[in-house]
Amino acid sequence: GLFALLQFPMTIMVGYRRAQTEIPFLDGGDATLLRRMRAHGNFVETVPMVLLAMAFAEWNGLPPSWLWAGGLCLLAGRLLHAWWTLEHAWGVPRAFGMVLTFLPMLGFGGWTFYKGLV
Protein backbone atom coordinates (compact mmCIF):
# COMPACT_ATOMS: atom_id res chain seq x y z
CA GLY A 1 0.00 0.00 0.00
CA LEU A 2 2.80 2.43 0.83
CA PHE A 3 4.40 2.15 -2.59
CA ALA A 4 1.03 2.77 -4.28
CA LEU A 5 0.76 5.95 -2.22
CA LEU A 6 4.25 6.96 -3.36
CA GLN A 7 3.41 6.34 -7.00
CA PHE A 8 0.24 8.43 -6.90
CA PRO A 9 1.85 11.89 -6.56
CA MET A 10 4.37 11.08 -9.29
CA THR A 11 1.51 10.16 -11.62
CA ILE A 12 -0.28 13.40 -10.76
CA MET A 13 2.91 15.44 -11.32
CA VAL A 14 3.28 14.04 -14.84
CA GLY A 15 -0.37 14.73 -15.66
CA TYR A 16 -0.21 18.23 -14.20
CA ARG A 17 2.87 19.10 -16.26
CA ARG A 18 1.20 17.71 -19.38
CA ALA A 19 -1.79 19.97 -18.74
CA GLN A 20 0.48 22.99 -18.15
CA THR A 21 2.46 22.45 -21.35
CA GLU A 22 -0.36 20.97 -23.46
CA ILE A 23 1.90 18.04 -24.39
CA PRO A 24 -0.34 14.95 -24.64
CA PHE A 25 2.33 12.39 -25.63
CA LEU A 26 6.06 11.89 -25.11
CA ASP A 27 7.93 14.84 -23.55
CA GLY A 28 7.73 17.45 -26.32
CA GLY A 29 11.27 18.57 -25.48
CA ASP A 30 10.19 19.79 -22.03
CA ALA A 31 12.99 18.94 -19.57
CA THR A 32 10.72 19.14 -16.51
CA LEU A 33 8.18 16.79 -18.04
CA LEU A 34 10.94 14.39 -19.06
CA ARG A 35 12.35 14.30 -15.51
CA ARG A 36 8.89 13.68 -14.07
CA MET A 37 8.19 10.97 -16.62
CA ARG A 38 11.49 9.22 -15.87
CA ALA A 39 11.04 9.43 -12.09
CA HIS A 40 7.59 7.88 -12.47
CA GLY A 41 8.72 5.42 -15.14
CA ASN A 42 11.71 4.20 -13.18
CA PHE A 43 9.49 3.66 -10.15
CA VAL A 44 7.03 1.61 -12.22
CA GLU A 45 9.87 -0.33 -13.86
CA THR A 46 11.47 -1.44 -10.61
CA VAL A 47 9.08 -1.48 -7.64
CA PRO A 48 6.61 -4.16 -8.80
CA MET A 49 9.36 -6.69 -9.55
CA VAL A 50 11.11 -6.07 -6.22
CA LEU A 51 7.81 -6.42 -4.32
CA LEU A 52 7.06 -9.64 -6.18
CA ALA A 53 10.53 -10.98 -5.41
CA MET A 54 10.02 -9.90 -1.78
CA ALA A 55 6.75 -11.85 -1.59
CA PHE A 56 8.42 -14.96 -3.02
CA ALA A 57 11.36 -14.54 -0.65
CA GLU A 58 8.96 -14.38 2.30
CA TRP A 59 7.11 -17.42 0.99
CA ASN A 60 10.45 -19.22 0.76
CA GLY A 61 11.31 -18.53 4.38
CA LEU A 62 13.48 -15.41 4.34
CA PRO A 63 13.64 -14.15 7.95
CA PRO A 64 11.48 -11.10 8.75
CA SER A 65 14.50 -8.97 9.68
CA TRP A 66 15.85 -9.38 6.12
CA LEU A 67 12.44 -8.61 4.65
CA TRP A 68 12.25 -5.41 6.70
CA ALA A 69 15.81 -4.41 5.81
CA GLY A 70 15.18 -4.97 2.12
CA GLY A 71 11.85 -3.17 2.24
CA LEU A 72 13.40 -0.16 3.96
CA CYS A 73 16.26 -0.11 1.42
CA LEU A 74 13.71 -0.14 -1.39
CA LEU A 75 11.70 2.65 0.23
CA ALA A 76 14.76 4.82 0.86
CA GLY A 77 16.12 4.12 -2.61
CA ARG A 78 12.89 5.02 -4.36
CA LEU A 79 12.43 8.21 -2.34
CA LEU A 80 16.01 9.32 -2.96
CA HIS A 81 15.93 8.48 -6.66
CA ALA A 82 12.58 10.19 -7.27
CA TRP A 83 13.46 13.30 -5.27
CA TRP A 84 16.79 13.76 -7.01
CA THR A 85 15.46 12.95 -10.50
CA LEU A 86 12.67 15.49 -10.12
CA GLU A 87 15.15 18.22 -9.21
CA HIS A 88 18.27 17.32 -11.19
CA ALA A 89 19.21 15.34 -14.26
CA TRP A 90 22.04 13.34 -12.68
CA GLY A 91 24.01 13.05 -9.47
CA VAL A 92 25.38 10.83 -6.75
CA PRO A 93 22.13 10.79 -4.72
CA ARG A 94 20.22 9.51 -7.74
CA ALA A 95 22.80 6.76 -8.32
CA PHE A 96 22.75 5.87 -4.61
CA GLY A 97 18.96 5.62 -4.82
CA MET A 98 19.38 3.05 -7.57
CA VAL A 99 21.93 1.11 -5.51
CA LEU A 100 19.44 1.01 -2.63
CA THR A 101 16.87 -0.33 -5.08
CA PHE A 102 19.19 -2.93 -6.59
CA LEU A 103 20.22 -4.36 -3.20
CA PRO A 104 16.78 -5.78 -2.32
CA MET A 105 16.14 -6.67 -5.97
CA LEU A 106 19.27 -8.83 -6.01
CA GLY A 107 18.84 -10.04 -2.43
CA PHE A 108 15.21 -11.14 -2.71
CA GLY A 109 15.73 -12.49 -6.22
CA GLY A 110 18.88 -14.33 -5.20
CA TRP A 111 17.25 -15.87 -2.15
CA THR A 112 14.26 -17.04 -4.16
CA PHE A 113 16.51 -18.45 -6.90
CA TYR A 114 18.66 -20.25 -4.31
CA LYS A 115 15.64 -21.73 -2.54
CA GLY A 116 14.35 -22.94 -5.89
CA LEU A 117 17.58 -24.88 -6.43
CA VAL A 118 17.72 -26.60 -3.03
Where are these regions (language model features)?
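Alpha-helical transmembrane segments
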Residues: 1-9
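Physicochemical signature of membrane-embedded alpha-helices that form the seven-helix bundle of GPCRs
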Residues: 2, 37-40, 70-73, 97-100, ...
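Cytosolic, membrane-interface loops and tails of multi-pass inner-membrane proteins
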Residues: 12-38
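Juxtamembrane loop-transmembrane helix junctions in multi-pass integral membrane proteins
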Residues: 32, 36-42, 58, 62-65, ...
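Core segments of transmembrane alpha-helices
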Residues: 41-54, 105
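Interfacial loop-to-transmembrane junctions
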Residues: 80-106
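Juxtamembrane boundary at the C-terminal end of a transmembrane helix
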Residues: 110-118
